[in-house]
Amino acid sequence: EDAQVTDLPDHEQEHLAXHKIAPXLAEFAY
């Protein structure tokens, strides 16, 4: 759904995906 995501590097896509799936866990991971 986010057209911008596909333009980002893989690690950035994973970063955004983590925030969408588990925001609380993403805060610890990053």
Curated annotation (Swiss-Prot):
Where is it localised?
A: Secreted
- GO terms classed as biological process: acute-phase response
What does the entry state regarding organ or tissue expression?
Plasma.
Claim: Glycoprotein is one of the keywords in the record: yes
Q: Posttranslational modification, per the record?
A: N-glycosylated; contains bi- and triantennary glycans.
Q: Which family does it belong to?
A: Belongs to the serpin family.
Q: What is known of its domains?
A: The reactive center loop (RCL) extends out from the body of the protein and directs binding to the target protease. The protease cleaves the serpin at the reactive site within the RCL, establishing a covalent linkage between the carboxyl group of the serpin reactive site and the serine hydroxyl of the protease. The resulting inactive serpin-protease complex is highly stable.
Name of protein = Alpha-1-antiproteinase
Q: Which organism is it from?
A: Chinchilla lanigera (Long-tailed chinchilla)
